[in-house]
């Protein structure tokens, strides 16, 4: 199986190298990732600037390329320029820190996987829960084992798996659960600070809000030392609300 690997933490980040080294023991791996950190860039693509592609001279048993762009740029270039064909699987990660609830909207890691899904490639985003103490070896071993069990060819086009792995030793992982994207979000605020020259600047702060009653909420699996596996879609239409609107309103014609 040929696997294209990307991320948003940067091409030399510990998470992506750990994942690529682990996967390359069994699969053909090609890494195409941002040359600098692109965390929380969402699904941005580069339209008004050139993109630079460089092959890195690193002593690994896989090829590794940097792109002067976003994770979505990397996936596009990885498929069209580096490989010249679709890989069998795309994996984005391992992210430093979780991508749960509304994180998915902002995440470059998740967007890398969704870009693969748009291209018709079975795609997975994988994150290690703790930002302060990520355990990449646990997440990488889980993915290697997961690929033995899960038929990635069953993932429909325009769908990706968002996988979050508890940051604990592998022998403490209880298993994996199919979950839903939760309503986990942040209570954000901006702290006003003063720079050395006396000017004001702002730093975004916030606390996590976890009050989703759904027992299948993604973060609840993590709290019990289960890996959270959530199928997510490129499409954002609120089907339930659309149906209610259709029951109330007819199509309107402007005269």
UniProtKB/Swiss-Prot annotation:
What range does the record give for the signal peptide?
Answer: none
Q: Which positions in this protein are listed as binding a divalent metal cation?
A: 8-9, 39, 95
Xref: Gene3D superfamilies: Survival protein SurE-like phosphatase/nucleotidase
Which UniProt keywords are present, listed alphabetically? Cytoplasm, Hydrolase, Metal-binding, Nucleotide-binding
* Cofactor(s) needed by this chain: a divalent metal cation
Q: Which GO terms describe its cellular component?
A: cytoplasm
Molecular function terms, GO-annotated: 3'-nucleotidase activity; 5'-nucleotidase activity; exopolyphosphatase activity; metal ion binding; nucleotide binding
Q: Which EC number(s) does UniProt give? A: 3.1.3.5
Q: What is its main location?
A: cytoplasm
As its record notes, the protein acts as a catalyst of: a ribonucleoside 5'-phosphate + H2O = a ribonucleoside + phosphate
Per the entry, what this protein does is: Nucleotidase that shows phosphatase activity on nucleoside 5'-monophosphates.
The family note in this entry says: Belongs to the SurE nucleotidase family.
Xref: HAMAP family: SurE
| Protein name in the entry | 5'-nucleotidase SurE
- Gene name of this polypeptide: surE
């Amino acid at each position: 199986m040929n696997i294209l690997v990307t991320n948003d933490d940067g091409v030399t980040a510990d998470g992506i190298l750990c994942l690529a080294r682990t996967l390359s023991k069994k699969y053909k791996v090609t890494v195409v990732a941002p040359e600098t950190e692109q965390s929380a860039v969402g699904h941005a693509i580069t339209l008004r600037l050139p993109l630079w592609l460089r092959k890195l001279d690193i002593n690994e048993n896989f090829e590794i390329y940097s792109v002067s762009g976003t994770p979505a740029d990397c996936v596009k270039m990885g498929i069209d320029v580096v490989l010249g064909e679709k890989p069998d699987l795309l994996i984005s990660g391992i992210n430093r820190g979780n991508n749960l609830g509304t994180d998915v909207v902002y995440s470059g890691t998740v967007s890398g996987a969704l870009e693969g899904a748009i291209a018709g490639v079975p795609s997975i985003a994988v994150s290690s829960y703790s930002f302060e103490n990520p355990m990449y070896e646990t997440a990488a071993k889980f993915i290697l084992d997961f690929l033995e069990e899960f038929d990635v060819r069953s993932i429909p086009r325009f769908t990706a798996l968002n996988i979050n792995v508890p940051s604990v030793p592998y022998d403490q992982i209880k298993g994996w659960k199919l979950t839903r994207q939760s309503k986990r979000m942040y209570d954000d605020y901006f702290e006003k600070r003063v720079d050395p020259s006396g000017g004001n600047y702002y730093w975004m702060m916030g606390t996590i809000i976890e009050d989703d009653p759904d027992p299948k909420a993604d973060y609840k699996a993590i709290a019990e030392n289960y890996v959270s596996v959530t199928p997510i879609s490129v499409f954002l239409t609120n089907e339930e609300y659309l149906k209610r609107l259709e029951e109330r309103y007819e199509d309107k014609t402007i005269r």
